[in-house]
Amino acid sequence: MALIPFDDRDGVIWMNGEMVDWRDARPHTLTHALHYGSQVFEGERAYGGTIFKSREHTQRLRSSCHYLDFDLPVSDEEMDSIKDMVLAANNIIDGYVRAFCWRGSEMMAISA
């Protein structure tokens, strides 16, 4: 059985404030996260079309962003809504969602 690579699948991903085609969701090669690992994520399970403890996951994601000194650019309510929209747009009833945030390419230096 051949596996479909993760970068060649059908669906949509929320990226930089909009839904984008799965195949087009690519960070720039000079993004800080690729060079220095400055990324946070939260793995979340969905059951019956609803993310289990979504708000708690969002709050933990926000806290993780804080530890790396960057902001989650949306409110908790907006983040929960975005995750629900991604589930619906991809017809996910029972599945896994990974919300993640990273620093962009606006800064490549190491700072203290």
Predicted feature residues:
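Conserved alpha/beta cores of soluble small-molecule-handling proteins
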Residues: 1-112
